[in-house]
C-alpha cells in the first residue's frame, strides 16, 4: 500500500525562487573558490605575454626596444716603453672608463608560425652614446693598449713554419706595426686603421672582410645577419631552437653528428629577455647571444622581492662558464681551453681572441701573474640575472665580459716578443639592463600588490553573496505559508483533500475487511 503523498506547502513562485537562489548561490561560492585558486590577475598578465597581435609582448617585439647599457672600460698600459724595452718584466695596466652606450634593437623579418609554435626574426642592433653615464667623450680620451691585430696574428702564426713567421716579420717592418698603440677611445671601439689588417683584407677578402678594427664595431657587426627561431610552447617559451636554420653552434662542430653535445646545442638556451612562466629553481637555464659565440652557464642563487611587487629568482653566472667541463668541452677544439677564459676565435675571423669575466674574475691567478692592476671583484665583475618567476620576465641584468689576446710564444717577432706567453687584456664591457619603465612597474604592481587584494575582495564578496542566497533558499523551506484565502484553499486542495480521500479509502477497506470476516464466521457456524 502506497503512503499518502507528502504535502508541499511551497507556492509555484517560491519553488522557482528556491531553485534560482540555490543554483546561483552554489555558482557564486564555486566562483569565489576558483578565483582564489586560479589567480585571474596572473592569467590576464600571461595572456598579454602571448606573442599574438594586440598583446603587449607582440607590440614590444615588433617595435624598437631600448636595450641594455654597454659600458666600455679600456686597459691603459702605463709602462709601455719600459715593458717593450725589457726594463720592466711586468705589464702595468689601469682601467679607463666607463664609456657607455645604449642598445637600440629592432627585429626584422618578424614571423609568428602558429602551426610550428615558433617565432622567427633577425635582430638588428644600433647603439647610442650616453654622455651622462660616461667619464668623457670617447674621441677626447687617448689610451695606450696592446695592438689586438698584431698580437693575434703573431700568435696565430706561432705554430706555422719558419717561412710564414719570416713573412710576418717582413710585413711588420714594412708597415711599421707596433705591439702597443695609442689611440682615441672612439677609434679603438669603432675602427682604426691597422696596416696588417688592411693588407689581409686585400690579400684574402673572403677571410677578413673589413679594413679597420674596432672592438664594438666587430661585436655589433650588422652586416652578418642571423635569424633566430624561438619556441612559443608554454613549457619552453622563448627557448632558442635554431640560429640560421641550425639547432646548434656550427662554429663549434655542431654539423658533425659525432661531436654534438649539450655544449654546442641550444638545449635550455635563451636569448635573455624572457623565459617560460612558472620557473622553478631546479630548471636549468643558459644564455645565448651571438656576440658570445657560445652559451653562458648560470646557476640559481636565491630570491628577492622588488618594491613594486615581483618575486624574483636570482641567478649568477656560473664558474662552469669559464672552466673545462662537459658543458664546455666542445669549445676547446681551436686554441685549447684555459681555466677562466673562453675561446672566441671561430667567431672572430679565426684570430686568437678569448673572453673572460672582467679583471679575470674567477680565473686562476697564474692567468694574470705578470700583469699589475688586475683586481677581480665579484660585486663589480660577476654576473647576476633576476627573473620574475611567475611571468618569466627578465627584470634585472648585470654582467661583464672581457676581450683578451692569449699571446703564445711569439719571440720570433721583434715587436711582439715582450708579450710572449701573456694573456693581454684589451678591454671589458659591463652590460646592465635599464630600469623598467614606470608603466611596466605599474603593471607589475597591479599584478602583485593590488591584484591579490582585489581578488580577495571580489572572492569574499562572491562567497558572501553565494552563502546569502543559499541561506534565503533554506529559509523558503521553513517559512510558513501566509494565511490568505488562496493559500487556505490551496492547502485544502493539495493537502487536506488528499488526506481525506486517503482516510476514506482506508475506512472502506476496513469495512470490507470486517464484512469479509463476518462472512467467513457464518460459514463455519
Predicted regions and their residues:
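Extracellular or lumenal secretory-pathway regions
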Residues: 2-306, 310-311, 318-393, 398-517
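A positional/structural detector of protein chain ends, strongest at the extreme C-terminus
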Residues: 1-3, 522-525
Amino acid at each position: 500500500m502506497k503512503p499518502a503523498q507528502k504535502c508541499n506547502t511551497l507556492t509555484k513562485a517560491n519553488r522557482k525562487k528556491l531553485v534560482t537562489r540555490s543554483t546561483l548561490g552554489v555558482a557564486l561560492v564555486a566562483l569565489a573558490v576558483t578565483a582564489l585558486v586560479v589567480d585571474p590577475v596572473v592569467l590576464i598578465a600571461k595572456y598579454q605575454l602571448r606573442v599574438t597581435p594586440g598583446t603587449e609582448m607582440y607590440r614590444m617585439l615588433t617595435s624598437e626596444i631600448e636595450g641594455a647599457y654597454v659600458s666600455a672600460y679600456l686597459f691603459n698600459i702605463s709602462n709601455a716603453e719600459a715593458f717593450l724595452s725589457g726594463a720592466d718584466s711586468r705589464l702595468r695596466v689601469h682601467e679607463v672608463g666607463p664609456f657607455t652606450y645604449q642598445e637600440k634593437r629592432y627585429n626584422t623579418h618578424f614571423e609568428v608560425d602558429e602551426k610550428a609554435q615558433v617565432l622567427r626574426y633577425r635582430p638588428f642592433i644600433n647603439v647610442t652614446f650616453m654622455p651622462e653615464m660616461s667619464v668623457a667623450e670617447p674621441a677626447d680620451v687617448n689610451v695606450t693598449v696592446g695592438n689586438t691585430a698584431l698580437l693575434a696574428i703573431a700568435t696565430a702564426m706561432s705554430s706555422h713554419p719558419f717561412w710564414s713567421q719570416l713573412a710576418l716579420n717582413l710585413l711588420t717592418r714594412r708597415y711599421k706595426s707596433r705591439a702597443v698603440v695609442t689611440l682615441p677611445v672612439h677609434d679603438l671601439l669603432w675602427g682604426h686603421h691597422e696596416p696588417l689588417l688592411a693588407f689581409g683584407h686585400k690579400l684574402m677578402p673572403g677571410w677578413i672582410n673589413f679594413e679597420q678594427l674596432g672592438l664594438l664595431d666587430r661585436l655589433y657587426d650588422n652586416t652578418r645577419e642571423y635569424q633566430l627561431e624561438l619556441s612559443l610552447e608554454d613549457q619552453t617559451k622563448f627557448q632558442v631552437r635554431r640560429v640560421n636554420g641550425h639547432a646548434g653552434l656550427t662554429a663549434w662542430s655542431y654539423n658533425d653528428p659525432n661531436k654534438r653535445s649539450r655544449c654546442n646545442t641550444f638545449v635550455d638556451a635563451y636569448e635573455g629577455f624572457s623565459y617560460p612562466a612558472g620557473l622553478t629553481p631546479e630548471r636549468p637555464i643558459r644564455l645565448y647571444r651571438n656576440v658570445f659565440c657560445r652559451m653562458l652557464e648560470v646557476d640559481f642563487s636565491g630570491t628577492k622581492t622588488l618594491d613594486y611587487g615581483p618575486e624574483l629568482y636570482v641567478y649568477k653566472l656560473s664558474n662552469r662558464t669559464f672552466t673545462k667541463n662537459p658543458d664546455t668541452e666542445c669549445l676547446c677544439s681551436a686554441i685549447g681551453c684555459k681555466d677562466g677564459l673562453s675561446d672566441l676565435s671561430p667567431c672572430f675571423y679565426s684570430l686568437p681572441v678569448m673572453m673572460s669575466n672582467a679583471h679575470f674574475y674567477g680565473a686562476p691567478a697564474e692567468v694574470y701573474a705578470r700583469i699589475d692592476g688586475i683586481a677581480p671583484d665579484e660585486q663589480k665583475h660577476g654576473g647576476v640575472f633576476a627573473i620574475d618567476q611567475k611571468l618569466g620576465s627578465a627584470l634585472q641584468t648585470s654582467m661583464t665580459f672581457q676581450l683578451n689576446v692569449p699571446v703564445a710564444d711569439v719571440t720570433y717577432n721583434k715587436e711582439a716578443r715582450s708579450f710572449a706567453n701573456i694573456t693581454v687584456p684589451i678591454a671589458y664591457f659591463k652590460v646592465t639592463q635599464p630600469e623598467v619603465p614606470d608603466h611596466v612597474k605599474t603593471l607589475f604592481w597591479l599584478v602583485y600588490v593590488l591584484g591579490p587584494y582585489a581578488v580577495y575582495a571580489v572572492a569574499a564578496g562572491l562567497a558572501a553573496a553565494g552563502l546569502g542566497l543559499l541561506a534565503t533558499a533554506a529559509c523558503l523551506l521553513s517559512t510558513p505559508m501566509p494565511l490568505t484565502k488562496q493559500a487556505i484553499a490551496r492547502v485544502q486542495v493539495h493537502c487536506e483533500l488528499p488526506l481525506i480521500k486517503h482516510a476514506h479509502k482506508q475506512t472502506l477497506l476496513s469495512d470490507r475487511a470486517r464484512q469479509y470476516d463476518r462472512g467467513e464466521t457464518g460459514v463455519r457456524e
